[in-house]
Amino acid sequence: MSDDENIIKKIIHEGTKAEKLELFGFEFQTPRKKIRSKFKLFARACYPRFFDEKSADFHDDVIMDLIMSYISDNKLVAGFRGCAKTSLAKLFIVFVLLNDKDEHRKYLKVLTKELKNAKQIVTDSYNLILEVSNLYGDQFAKEGDIKREETMGGYTMRNGTKISAGTIGQTQRGHVQDAYRPDWILFDDTEDVKSISSMVITQSIIESCAEAIKGLSLDGSFFVSCNYISDQGVVQWFMNKASVDVRIIPLLTDDQ
């Protein structure tokens, strides 16, 4: 183990709050590979239960795609169920909400075919932030004695950064238009076997995705986490977009 690794290990286990916050914190100008290293340190130190098994080699690529998407690029990662792409995305959301010193993104949005799935991702991120309140303090905005948005479809951080859940499935009755344009979108579970069997449903989802992308802020970007189940569906529509960088994760074999 190198001297630097020993120092990092000592900070994680014995360091002050200030030392840990500096270890995990990043800025827009921080080299991207260094941000990835900081994310991995943060995730493993704060949420070790997500790493009971050895991480697959492709996880580094997925993390880098998340970082580049958050910074400026449109990325798509298509992988098999169980490859941890959604878990990594949730941990990444928590990482940037807590550690981005420049607050590069001010409004994050999670969009799924079924609204309940987007709400679950948002709620999970909220609960993960609560778990590290001993290090980061209370990070949620309060307005007098008004109850914070806890298990609902969104919440606001103390610095003003927002995250909310939405759907690209059926139109929600009473849907309220966003007052502000999101500047980063996570598309997750945009289609399934049922939706792919209907061109009407597929086209409706595509139109909703297109509308969401059009509604991004001028410097906004998005990340698509998906399973590639058809070359005629929503995922293929994303893949065909010239502005989207695509990564397809192959199935692991027994020796991988």
Q: What kind of region is each of these model predictions?
A:
Residues 1-83, 87-256:
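Short, flexible loop motifs at catalytic/binding sites
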